[in-house]
């Protein structure tokens, strides 16, 4: 998370946006500044991003981005496309949209959240209205969990007050201290208003490795049965995935009221990636760097990756996460 775009702009026109790394005292000071420019929204928007400037979501553009940038994830792409486009087209949603993305490292969870943000705000993850929390960075100490709960509620309340269509992304949910995330339960529930603030248009996205074993088991069973992974349906995954995450003591969702009260709209499985998907990632990366696609280099990079299970060697250990650094070695030759 970042501070203001410039010190001068912050002093003159500072929006009431509370950053995860900002002191709470700063947010209180900014509330006073708000009154000096509240009557001049057009003037303010000449200098900084405004909530009202959010993009009008194009379902076709979102689908194109998902198809061109997210590989091997037919379930995730369908759920994200329908959930996000449907939510944003609803002028009066009953509750915030909550997506919980699950899968191994390198399968595309962070990338999917980036795509969502970019299709709603031009600045994407750098937008003033998109807020990223990383469990090990922002909530490192179990002894401070009570303080974290209070701060988290204040940060979310302040940001949604400034922009109803705020997006909150919680990464490393599997490393978050159990019970902490329950602090935001009132904001995710079916309330019109909580303490004079409506959260119904906000979006909450949770990213986690929890449940990845269950996802792999289903994908491997389909592979052993000679079925295509595209035949896997959400119903084959979602119920067992929710139970697995709820009962995982190493997950921030362990016995969470968010799951118990059915406040997570979708548990989105990200399947482990196969050899062919790694080649897709490498191919797109070469194109994005302006290199001519070289299938020989693509194959060499993909073959350097390690695969599991030990016997079958079907799925990439790290997904597409490290293929880009390995690509550097061959491009420098």
UniProtKB/Swiss-Prot annotation:
Observed effect of gene inactivation: Animals fail to feed or vocalize and die within 48 hours of birth. At 18 dpc, the global structure of the central nervous system is normal. However, at the cellular level, nuclear envelope abnormalities, with membranous vesicle-appearing structures in the perinuclear space, are observed in multiple areas of the central nervous system, including neurons of the spinal cord, pons, frontal cortex, and hippocampus.
Compartment annotation: Endoplasmic reticulum lumen; Nucleus membrane; Cell projection, Growth cone; Cytoplasmic vesicle membrane
Name of the featured protein: Torsin-1A
Subunit organization: Homohexamer. Interacts with TOR1B; the interaction may be specific of neural tissues. Interacts (ATP-bound) with TOR1AIP1 and TOR1AIP2; the interactions induce ATPase activity. Interacts with KLHL14; preferentially when ATP-free. Interacts with KLC1 (via TPR repeats); the interaction associates TOR1A with the kinesin oligomeric complex. Interacts with COPS4; the interaction associates TOR1A with the CSN complex. Interacts with SNAPIN; the interaction is direct and associates SNAPIN with the CSN complex. Interacts with STON2.
Cysteine pairings via disulfide bonds: none
Gene name linked to the record: Tor1a
Keyword Signal: yes
Any one biological process term the GO annotation gives: cell adhesion
Swiss-Prot/TrEMBL keywords: ATP-binding, Cell projection, Chaperone, Cytoplasm, Cytoplasmic vesicle, Cytoskeleton, Endoplasmic reticulum, Glycoprotein, Hydrolase, Membrane, Nucleotide-binding, Nucleus, Signal, Synapse, Synaptosome
Region ranges (Interaction with SYNE3): 313-333
Glycosylation sites recorded in the entry for this protein: 144, 159
Topological relation to the membrane, as annotated: Peripheral membrane protein
EC annotation from Swiss-Prot or TrEMBL: 3.6.4.-
Principal location: endoplasmic reticulum
Annotated GO CC locations: cytoplasm; cytoplasmic vesicle membrane; cytoskeleton; endoplasmic reticulum; endoplasmic reticulum lumen; endoplasmic reticulum membrane; growth cone; nuclear envelope
GO molecular-function term, one example from the UniProt record: ATP binding
């Amino acid at each position: 998370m970042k501070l203001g775009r410039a010190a001068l702009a912050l002093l003159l026109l500072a929006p009431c946006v509370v950053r995860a790394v900002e002191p709470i005292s700063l947010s209180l000071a900014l509330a006073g500044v708000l009154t000096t420019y509240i009557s001049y929204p057009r003037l303010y928007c000449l200098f900084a991003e405004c909530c009202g400037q959010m993009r009008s979501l194009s379902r076709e553009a979102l689908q194109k981005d998902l198809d061109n940038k997210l590989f091997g994830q037919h379930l995730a792409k369908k759920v994200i496309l329908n959930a996000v486009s449907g939510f944003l087209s609803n002028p009066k949603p009953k509750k915030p949209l909550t997506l919980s993305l699950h899968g191994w490292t390198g399968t595309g969870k962070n990338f999917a959240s980036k795509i969502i943000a970019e299709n709603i705000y031009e600045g994407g993850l750098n937008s003033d209205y998109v807020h990223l929390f990383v469990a090990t960075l922002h909530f490192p100490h179990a002894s401070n969990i009570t303080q974290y709960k209070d701060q988290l509620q204040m940060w979310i309340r302040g940001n949604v007050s400034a922009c109803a269509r705020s997006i909150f992304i919680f990464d490393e949910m599997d490393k978050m201290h159990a019970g902490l995330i329950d602090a935001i339960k009132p904001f995710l529930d079916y309330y019109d208003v909580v303490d004079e603030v409506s959260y119904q248009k906000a979006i909450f996205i949770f990213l986690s490795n929890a449940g990845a074993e269950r996802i792999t088991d289903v994908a491997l069973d389909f592979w052993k049965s000679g079925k295509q992974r595209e035949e896997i349906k959400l119903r084959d995954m979602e119920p067992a995935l929710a139970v697995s995450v709820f009962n995982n003591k190493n997950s921030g969702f362990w016995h969470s009221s968010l799951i118990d009260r059915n406040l997570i709209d979708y548990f989105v499985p990200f399947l482990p990636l196969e050899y062919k998907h790694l080649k897709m990632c490498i191919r797109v990366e070469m194109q994005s760097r302006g290199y001519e696609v070289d299938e020989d280099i693509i194959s060499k990079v993909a073959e350097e990756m390690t695969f599991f299970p030990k016997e079958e060697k079907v799925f990439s250990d790290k997904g597409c996460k490290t293929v880009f650094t390995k690509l550097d070695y061959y491009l420098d030759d």
